[in-house]
């Protein structure tokens, strides 16, 4: 009699196969599958853990599988590869799942012809997995970092070049742990104290941020269907993104341009900071995404946002020098959010080569919308200097009318008007912010 397949693990396998074959983002594939699923909440949580965990730890898991089998992972069928990864991930990282269950449940999902092989590899890990040696840190440091932190060798080398090897390892280690969810309290509807109290009464752990009073860190998962989020009393926004909004510093009555606004969290935070007084022009290249801002603003009780489809590189003379503040949160390589989007780590680094010029073009165009004495903020969710400090330097070299201005928030201080946040320092996304002021 064949063992019944575990539906949670079966769905996780389907999602992993789909992301491999279609190149779909993990979070999008997962969200789509879970919305259609009738699984229980604990089973959905297991699916999420397996999909994110296997994606994040792929290099480490493949290294282990190759050490346990005479057949290299790259030569195996895609489904079998993902089954071995799922099984090994449970054995290596999920202590709460007994080893026998991890093995048997994984084997039950395998094609009949591959069950013996999958069973043999996983059982071999239970016998000698702890004895497998990783590459030597001294003689093969790049390979050691790659296998230990499941990052491609070229990315390890780049991070070591940027930060130095010791600091880079701290950053890599932090990218292996998803940061706690951070909420931005909508002070148009609730106070931080009220929000914290209500969430605690519902059984969620929340902690006030020591950086921003409107930020609440939530170690527990808070479902999007919770009353506080549904009623717009708060929304999810990483602390780095909230810091960016504070650096922009919009005041009630200001005219603000958010040049690359979708999905809208910085737009919303800015409107709340303005007490819903003034005007925000929220633009994005993708018309299909603008509805996210409109629906989010309605839920939050914000009515000062005007959304339009616009390429931020294309000049609009009607906007010239109308804005007190302009935010250019530009498209970037995303190498600061590996903990949330683990598949980004496997991107070819050369794919981002064209981005700095695109980002600079946005900055050079949108700077013309800033009034004399106004503020221009440039931000990315990457930690690569060519998209960050180097781009700001290129901009300033041809725009002497702008000057960097230092800022400080909760003990976090900029240098030369620029700040790079890394997950090992403050538990945020990797993020870059530059504050530039137009001379009056």
Language model features with spans:
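S-adenosylmethionine
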Residues: 1-440
